[in-house]
Swiss-Prot record:
Pfam families: Mem_trans. This is Probable auxin efflux carrier component 5a. Expressed in leaves, shoot apex and panicles. Expressed in roots, stem bases, stems, leaves and young panicles. GO terms for molecular function: auxin efflux transmembrane transporter activity; identical protein binding; protein homodimerization activity. GO terms for biological process: auxin export across the plasma membrane; auxin polar transport; auxin-activated signaling pathway. It comes from Oryza sativa subsp. japonica (Rice). May act as a component of the auxin efflux carrier. The chain crosses the membrane at residues 7-27, 39-59, 72-92, 103-123, 134-154, 222-242, 246-266, 281-301, 307-327, 342-362.
Length: 363
């Protein structure tokens, strides 16, 4: 049962995040320390250094041989349900590019959770040590599979947009060359015209593969889980110097991510940068669609009792901070994701307690 001491632990875990957010916001809005270009550089620092080390560090210390595979299967089914719902919605969208962009954002909003900061203390308070371990396992699986998948989709979108723009510019240049060739022919001059073609799928694959190969987020979780398997099987430990080097960088991950979010907020005209309609949509996707899909997946694989309850509650955890960093880095609805993170954490505590009470009543 949740007591006031447990509530305090959750609040104590989230207050430092808002402190970092406040510092980032004030450094731009009031103190004018950073320019827009410097804010982008801070976000890139977080995306390519702090977050990979953070992911690597917490993945290192998991035990892959104690994973609840039914819960993982339920998570996979829930994501498939969400993809099906979003795909059905996207078919009715009139603009293809807009549908793809909002499909990616909707997937982030409804599936990616802030498990380690809020989920771990809440699960421990509600159901004990085993529930905490289950939340950590699903968080590791999220880092390995869903965040990597999100990164891949964002890179594909970025590469496709870049090729489309380059192709359009090449076509325009070719058109000008044709006109110039006509004028030159009239004057008796020879001109070589440039040909513009549509970029091939293979060209897109090469660009995306090159970008992913250079992104440390691609390797962090895979290297971490590989070492975790070896360490738990062979009973070996990392050298203290190496672990200390990883730890000193990983500790900056969450704080710097919130600081970067504060920088972004300060550059917007309003606190709720995306507007109340999109903010409400984000909350519905996070706290309604996500838990509902997880309930379907959990029941489908036969989860029962407290394991089922923990699976549903962890799906209702607030928005992943990493999802904002990626959205900002790739220029995709960062205003929506920042609002979801900030206000999602504010409303998550009463909502999670509400989920807990309702699920206990329907035993």
């Amino acid at each position: 049962m949740i007591g006031w001491g447990d509530v305090y632990k959750v609040v104590a875990a989230t207050v430092p995040l808002y402190f970092a957010l406040f510092l980032g916001y004030g450094s731009v809005r009031w103190w004018r320390i950073f320019t827009r270009e410097q804010c982008d550089a801070v976000n890139r620092l977080v995306a390519f250094f702090a977050l990979p080390f953070f992911t690597f560090e917490f993945t290192l210390h998991t035990d892959p041989f104690q994973v609840n595979y039914r819960a993982v299967a339920a998570d996979v089914i829930s994501k498939a349900v969400i993809v099906a719902v979003i795909g059905a919605w996207a078919r009715f969208m009139s603009k293809g590019g807009c549908a793809v962009s909002w499909s990616i954002t909707s997937f982030s909003l409804s599936t990616l959770t802030n498990s380690l900061v809020v989920g771990v203390p809440m699960a421990r308070a509600m159901y004990g040590e085993w529930a905490q371990q289950l939340v950590v396992q699903l968080s590791v699986f999220q880092a390995i599979v869903w965040l990597t998948l999100l990164l891949f989709v964002l890179e594909v979108r970025k590469a496709a947009i870049g090729m489309y723009v380059d192709g359009a510019e090449a076509a325009a240049a070719a058109g000008k060359d044709v006109e110039a060739a006509g004028a030159a022919a009239a004057a008796g001059t020879v001109v070589v015209a440039a040909a513009a073609g549509k970029p091939s799928l293979w060209a897109l694959v090469k660009v995306v593969a090159h970008k992913l190969a250079r992104n440390p987020n691609t390797y962090a979780s895979f290297v971490g889980i590989t070492w975790a398997c070896l360490a738990n099987r062979l009973h070996i430990a990392l050298p203290s110097a190496f672990e200390g080097s990883v730890l000193i960088m990983s500790k900056s991950g969450t704080g710097m991510a919130m600081f970067s979010m504060g920088l972004f907020m300060a550059q917007q005209e309003k606190i709720i940068a995306c507007g109340t309609s999109f903010a409400a949509l984000g909350l519905v996707l996070k706290f309604a669609l996500g838990p509902a899909a997880m309930a379907i997946g959990s029941i489908a694989v036969g989860l029962r009792g407290d394991v089922l309850r923990v699976a549903i509650i962890q799906a209702a955890l607030p928005q992943s901070i990493t999802s904002f960093i990626f959205a900002k880095e790739y220029g995709l609805h960062a205003d929506v994701l920042s609002t979801a993170v900030i206000f999602g954490m504010l409303v998550s505590l009463p909502l999670l307690v509400g989920f807990y009470i309702v699920l206990e009543l329907i035993r």
